[in-house]
UniProtKB/Swiss-Prot annotation:
Protein's UniProt name: Peptide chain release factor 1
Lineage top rank: taxon: Bacteria
Primary location recorded for the protein, binned into one broad class: cytoplasm
Keywords for this protein: Cytoplasm, Methylation, Protein biosynthesis
Amino acid sequence: MIAIPSDRLDAILARHDIVTATLSAGEADSESFVQLSRELSDLDDVVAAIRAYRAADAELRGVEAMLEEGDPEMRALAAEEKPEVEAARDAAAKALQILLLPKDSADEKSAILEIRAGTGGDEAALFAGDLFRMYARYADLKGWKVEVVSESPGTMGGYREVVAEVKGRGVFARLKFESGAHRVQRVPETETQGRIHTSAATVAVLPEAEEVDIHVNEADLKIDTMRAQGAGGQHVNKTESAIRITHMPSGIVVFVQEERSQHKNRARAMAVLRARLYEQERSQKDAARAADRRAQVGSGDRSERIRTYNFPQGRVTDHRINLTLYKLEEVLAGTALDELVDALVTEHQAALLAAEGLG
């Protein structure tokens, strides 16, 4: 087991005391109060883990001291207890090491979820709809709120494209490994010969960005307003409530027409634009860090095939960690998605521990 520097732990405990005292004194302004409250919430978990680790380590040292005693019965008792006590200390150390890993500053944020049908025509659009329902059900189980920002329905159902806000604490941390190409293998309802078809859809999960995260210069925006359109292209209202925002430097275009209010559509379009620009900035920074590249579970590239959903076999396979679950229906219902997410998070943590020299 890698030793955890005691002075680092003491510094964390001291910081926890300072933040607690500052908040208790009630002298922080509103902005500082919010930041300190978030910091304290994060520190509380780490401090609890430090205390658990130190208690377990002290118990192990006590058992090891008993092994040095002259009483044969005490030595025998200590020898019997040591494996269990040592395992408990190592488990506490591992839990603490994970909490001490570098944090992704976006993990606690809400997210923008984008799903686009890929190869496979109508079947791909139906699969994109299946994926959206999977994430919507998963979000419901987590107590998150899902709001569709824009959608382009498929001719036989599903979506050619759907963009939604998923609001809640820690959404990005749980969904960020979903970015990539998802493949489905099944017999379409329109297939008369019973042949299995392969289709695909791409998923992108972007951390929701606030104005403090990314500055958007109004002079860089081209904003067009128009009447909202229905599925067949017909205008569905008489006011120009739909908004299309083009960010000239990057070429990013966002179109939103879901709300009747132009003001609300503009706000939603700006939220999506900020998220895309923020993710672009994060990707550029990540690409510059070789250690981060080694620690990623998959690249997060939208073209990277990350998962296959095989209906005839009732299985889901995540190719990044070679994990197969024969729980296709449960995964698509959102109830078993955590099994995949937890495995991906664990793999990511193991890679980070190795990169930090703690694995």
